[in-house]
Amino acid sequence: MAIDKIQSESINLADNFAFTGTVTGAGGANTPAFHAYNPQNGSVANQTEVIVSNNTELLDSSAAYDTSTYKFTPQVAGYYFLYANVRYQSGTTDFDRINLVITKNGTDILSARNNNKDYSTVCVSGIVQANGSSDYFQMKSYQNSGGSISITTDDEFTYFGGFLIKKS
């Protein structure tokens, strides 16, 4: 006997269900998505802000991240979750300030700050809106330690990524 309509009162929503057909309207695609990291040591001068050169892609589903300009330019309008992480290797130097910023079209929109010594890590994340054509996002960092220090490299320490969470 086929069931065409089920009353909502007769279903326990806490149960597990096994479907044999196609389920539509559940979930969605989280693309474009990207994740890029910096595999090479780079020295950052004291009191200097730089665009972080994450030039190696782990993921770029829609060719929206440029490894030469370090820009994420999504071609789908919507809301995106973006994240960034940077780690400085300083030995025993005390930092006056380390900033990590995600910019939209060159303007700071998400930022975090840390005052620390030794290995200092800063991360930032948030939800941003993109128009799907000309908006672009970059990751930049500033350090004020009294001297030049290196950004720690590898995909687990310095990276930039994001993905679509809702089309607009």
Q: Whereabouts are the PLM-identified features?
A:
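Short, surface-exposed beta-strand/strand-loop-strand elements in extracellular ectodomains
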Residues: 93-107
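Residues that act as N-cap/strand-start positions at coil-to-secondary-structure junctions
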Residues: 5, 66-68, 96, 120-122
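Register-specific beta-strand positions within repetitive beta-rich fiber domains
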Residues: 1-27
